[in-house]
Amino acid sequence: NVIAPINKERLESELGIRFRAFGTGWRYDWQSDGMLARVVRPDGKEVSFAYDALGRRIRKSFAGTTTHFVWDGNVPLHEWAETAESEESEMVTWLFEQDTFVPAAKLVANGECFSIISDYLGTPLQAYDKQGNKVWEQELDIYGRQRKRPSAFIPFKYQGQYEDAETGLYYNRFRYYDPNAGGYISQDPIGLAGGNPTLYGYVEDPNVLVDILGLTG
């Protein structure tokens, strides 16, 4: 499996990441159970993660802000952020189509609500407010990379994936997907028994298949 080189210009323009002169890259630190514990970015800033006993991510911390997550089975239900000054953002509730990982709506504690329109694969394409105004849209290429950089208003990508703007990775329940490389940053937890000789690959054909838990690839 070939890992694509880092596109520094894209990361700098879209994520605001600046590279050190001596070329320091990304650093990944892992827990003993194989879950990603921390990312040190090329600019030296750290992003840390915490998980519950089932391996579901419950916290993400970056630059003095911690985002908390509450789950409904294997899909996120609530999220909210708080800063070091104890300021909390409005809680967001995510609704999904029944028994799927396809997001259907975003509800904000202040009363705002938005409907989410997805394609045949369950990938969100657009979001609309109560008045029917389009407030967000995205278009992904075959690897899940965004053709145009939208806001993080709706963080979901391929079905089961949640984008972390701080790292450019997509959290995929049991693994993290790198859209720039077109694969996962860690091996399949069951190794070669998963039937993927690369150990890091995504699904065979992303035009018709999805990996909702990060275990199918």
Predicted regions and their residues:
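A motif-centric feature for acidic-aromatic and gly/ser/thr-rich catalytic loops and repeats
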Residues: 10-11, 106, 110-174, 180, ...
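A conserved catalytic-core signature of glycosyltransferases
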Residues: 91, 171-172, 197-198
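Short, conserved catalytic or interaction motifs in soluble domains
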Residues: 41, 130, 179, 192
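Short glycine/serine/proline-enriched coil/turn segments at secondary-structure junctions
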Residues: 86-87, 165-168, 193-194
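Compositionally biased, low-complexity segments of secreted and virulence-associated proteins
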Residues: 210, 214-217
